[in-house]
Amino acid sequence: KNVRRVIGLSMAGLSGEFPAALEKWTFDNLPISYVQGERQARNVLRESNLNYTILRLTWLYNDPENTNYELIPEGVQFNDAQVTREAVVKAIFDILHVDDETPFHRASIGIGEPGTHYDKPSFH
């Protein structure tokens, strides 16, 4: 009833922002029904009147020691092939605690691990 903000998680690559090799690998390794569901969920938020932030995640893996992340604005090529779940949690915490929410208001932001510009995640 008094929802002030929604953080939605979605997959990266739905807007053609991945390099060709990473995009091909991603879509070759996910069921089309999953990709369609991700698009539909993203569109529900975009068509709402909510203050939302959609976080576009690349391939996830676990590493409690690695919380490195970078934020990639929508419309910018997203080169990072992977990011840790721990880094995503840190990014969400950081976004929720910024003084100025303006960059995140009704925005779609990619989260990736710096320096992981691979054709597929390193763990595959």
Regions found by a protein language model. Give the residues of each.
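Conserved Rossmann-fold NAD(P)-dependent oxidoreductase catalytic core, especially the SDR/UDP-sugar
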Residues: K1-G37, R42-E47, T53
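Conserved beta-strand scaffold positions in the cores of enzyme catalytic domains, especially
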Residues: Y52-I54, S108
